[in-house]
UniProtKB/Swiss-Prot annotation:
Binding site for FAD: 17-46, 285-295
Enzyme Commission code: 1.14.13.127
Top-rank taxon, per record: Bacteria
Catalytic reaction list: 3-(3-hydroxyphenyl)propanoate + NADH + O2 + H(+) = 3-(2,3-dihydroxyphenyl)propanoate + NAD(+) + H2O; (2E)-3-(3-hydroxyphenyl)prop-2-enoate + NADH + O2 + H(+) = (2E)-3-(2,3-dihydroxyphenyl)prop-2-enoate + NAD(+) + H2O
Species, as recorded: Klebsiella pneumoniae subsp. pneumoniae (strain ATCC 700721 / MGH 78578)
Identification of the protein by name: 3-(3-hydroxy-phenyl)propionate/3-hydroxycinnamic acid hydroxylase
Entry's family note: Belongs to the PheA/TfdB FAD monooxygenase family.
Pfam families: FAD_binding_3
Gene3D superfamilies in the cross-refs: 3.30.70.2450, FAD/NAD(P)-binding domain
Function field: Catalyzes the insertion of one atom of molecular oxygen into position 2 of the phenyl ring of 3-(3-hydroxyphenyl)propionate (3-HPP) and hydroxycinnamic acid (3HCI).
Cofactor(s) the protein needs: FAD
Length: 554
């Protein structure tokens, strides 16, 4: 796709291996991962600064795992409230669904409240670790073009000056109104909700009760959410005929807040803003050297808090693949797996978010009556009720095609699903989360066995070239047995017995775990070599040192 570009030579030219348009959370996450992989990145943002008002309020365990992968989770956690429940209330205040999953299979609380601007700031400051990563604010993309080996962007600077960026790849993280997506003429099909909502953020929380409450009031549904650092968010449906200007008037604001506060005049307003809830999905996530991520690729209603988290999944999925391609360690075909893996799951999360919105504010009054009746019925069906309250209805990603080997496995297979992250014990005696051992790249994890056994030198070299770590998991009581040490293999103790249980459940011995922590393949020691060869070919990995391809590692 080529847009028209002027012939006048601009004053300033920038180069980078990857250009990212948009300094929101998805763009910042992409830049952090690529930065730690040594890739030169230029982030282009049309605003003068990061957005400093609260937007998304829910961050899940998968997103925290992405933060952990780029070394920022300890700075993010102080801006979160873990184990944040979501409670649906009838118009009379009865709680008919108390959703508070207490599982931590990925190492973190499954539902967390957070303050997005402060977490965005953590990611932005994280870029200072990488001298080859730069951000340009107050730059608007006016046009761009791509060839077989590069992308060129024309920018307009803060004082009207013209600049160009030449990059090998472009990632569009420029939001739901993405200029990049529109210029590429990629359809963005979906629906816009007929009703808007007004969001009101208040400092020094005047309510101060924990968790999130969604009141299914047919007159005016509303949401009340406790956020970190003493912030309270209220959301009220905007009724037909009302405008943002009208609702922002003091007497109307007082009327809204009187539904939820005894003294609506004693509040410290941070801001109010009217939102329209959209549910849209891009037809394609990639055209040649341009890729879409986050809201540029999909937008969804807020009711499951998955817009932000879906964007983080995009970034985590795409960043490691792009890093391998840019560094010459994999072919460009690897990037085709990004859409294969992410688009269907994004669609599932959109559908879930729309459904949750219908539970809160049914389009028809009779549907609300049916909802309330079903909520009573669930009390007599404990297994069904637990299914909802533990959020097992949330579509967990399971990739069935892409950068993995399914081998015809069904839904019960862990291939294409995220690997667990329990605590493990190091040989030093320190207890850490598993990802601290895995690092930022691939890991080949074996239960009770040395995963290098039976691999030839060429296979080991090929995978070490992309940073793989070989990890042997043993019962914690065996961690100090030095005779079992294998050169080049890290040993960890199974502190909580979770890894043994995982391998036993799936009747396997070795898991190949990708940088985004998804299982790419399973094997036993005698089949690992063949699996790695097949996976490398599917991912179009570059060939490693094969000089000793027939030499076995004992």
């Amino acid at each position: 796709m080529t847009t028209s570009t002027p012939d006048i030579q601009p004053a300033v030219q920038h180069t980078a291996q990857v250009a990212i348009v948009g300094a929101g959370p998805v763009g910042l996450m992409m830049a952090n991962y690529l930065g730690q992989m040594g890739i030169s990145v230029l982030v282009v943002e049309k605003l003068a600064t990061l957005i400093d008002y609260p937007r998304a309020i829910g961050i899940d365990d998968e997103s925290l795992r992405a933060m952990q992968a780029v070394g920022l989770v300890n700075d993010v956690l102080p801006h979160t409230t873990p184990w944040h429940a979501m409670r649906f209330l009838t118009p009379k205040g009865r709680c008919f669904a108390d959703i508070q999953p207490m599982t931590d299979e990925f190492g973190w609380s499954r539902r967390n409240a957070f303050i997005q601007p402060q977490v965005d700031a953590v990611m932005y400051h994280g870029l200072q670790r990488f001298p080859q990563v730069r951000c340009l604010f107050s730059r608007e993309v006016g046009a761009f073009s791509q060839t077989g080996d590069s992308v060129t962007l024309n920018l307009k600077g803060p004082d009207g000056e013209r600049e160009t960026v030449r990059a090998d790849w472009l990632v569009a993280c420029d939001g739901g109104a993405s200029f990049i997506r529109r210029t590429l003429n990629i359809p963005f099909e979906g629906k816009t909700a007929p009703n808007q909502w007004i969001v009101i953020d208040i400092a020094n929380d005047p309510l101060a009760t924990p968790h999130v409450y969604l009141c299914c009031d047919p007159v005016r549904p509303y949401v009340s959410a406790a956020l970190p650092h003493g912030v309270r968010r209220f959301e009220f449906m905007v009724m037909p005929g009302e405008t943002e200007a009208q609702l922002s008037e003091p007497h109307n604001m007082r009327r809204l807040l009187s539904k939820v506060l005894p003294d609506p005049d004693r509040v410290e307003l941070i801001r109010q803003r009217v939102y329209t809830h959209n549910a849209r999905l891009a037809e394609r996530f990639r055209i040649n050297r341009v890729l879409l991520a986050g809201d540029a690729a999909h937008i969804m209603p807020v009711w499951q808090g998955q817009g932000y988290n879906s964007g983080m999944r995009d970034a985590f999925n795409l960043a490691w693949k792009l890093a391998l391609v840019v560094n010459g360690k994999a072919g460009e075909a690897l990037l085709d797996s990004y859409q294969q893996e992410r688009r269907d799951h994004a669609k599932a999360m959109i559908d879930l978010s729309v459904t949750a919105g219908h539970v809160l504010a049914p389009p028809k009054r009779w549907q609300g009556a049916v909802r309330d009746g079903l909520s009573w019925l669930l009390n007599y069906l404990p297994p069904v009720k637990r299914y909802f309250l533990e959020m097992r209805f949330k579509p967990m990603p399971q990739y069935r095609e892409g950068a993995l080997l399914t081998d015809g496995a069904g839904k019960t297979s862990p291939v294409g699903k995220m690997f667990i992250q329990p605590q493990v014990t190091l040989e030093s005696g320190e207890s850490v989360l598993l990802d601290e051992v895995i690092g930022a790249n691939f890991a080949i994890i074996g239960w009770g066995c040395n995963p290098q056994w039976g691999l030839n030198a060429g296979q080991i070299a090929r995978w070490r070239a992309i940073g793989v770590r070989f990890i042997q998991v043993v019962p914690e009581v065996q961690i100090h047995r030095e005779q079992d040490n294998a050169p080049g293999t890290l040993r960890v103790g199974d502190t909580q017995n979770r890894l043994k249980s995982w391998f036993a459940l799936h009747n396997t011995a070795i898991a190949v775990v990708r940088p985004d922590r998804f299982v790419a393949a399973l094997a036993i020691p005698q089949t690992l070599g063949a699996q790695l060869t097949a996976l490398a070919e599917k991912m179009t990995l570059a060939t490693g040192d094969t000089a000793h391809a027939e030499e076995k590692v004992a």
